[in-house]
Amino acid sequence: MKKATLGALIAGAVIGLGISYVTAVLVDVTGKPEFCASCHTMKPMVESFHNSVHGGNNPQGFAVHHCTDCHLPKKSLMGYLVAKGISGTQDALAEFGLIKKVDFKENYWEMKHYVYDSACLQCHHMVKEPEKALSMSESSRFAHKYYWTQKKKGADISCVSCHNDYTMPHFAHPGLLDKLREE
């Protein structure tokens, strides 16, 4: 192999790795609550998240680290990246007034469109087989069996159909709806 060809291959590999690294860092940084809170419209969401079970306000002190852990689909890397690009672009355009901002107060109960079951199931995988989840109460096992039965029938049901701030005030964004009403 000629030195020029070998040099071009090595340079291409180094450039490719560099681009991959920068992309991975940007994907990580732009999913963190601090980044999301840099936009005025997301501040109430980030504040309420930090007071939630998922934000670390739990006996274990465990916290979900990125807004995108819950608010982007997790079925495939490509689907995740495409959704992140679309969502981020829409958020940025709305923040700068180029498109209409999402009315979070008006769309609060449409959360099934921006909280993904695939994200919930990454951590709460035991609900996939509720009959085997001995740590769950009997009523919780029953409810999750119902969820899976309905899902198989094609019902429009999601984790947040039941798990939301109204039914579980300590959930992901406690007091968010009240805070949005104040604005």
Question: What do these predicted regions represent?
Answer:
Residues 2-183:
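Short sequence/structural segments immediately N-terminal
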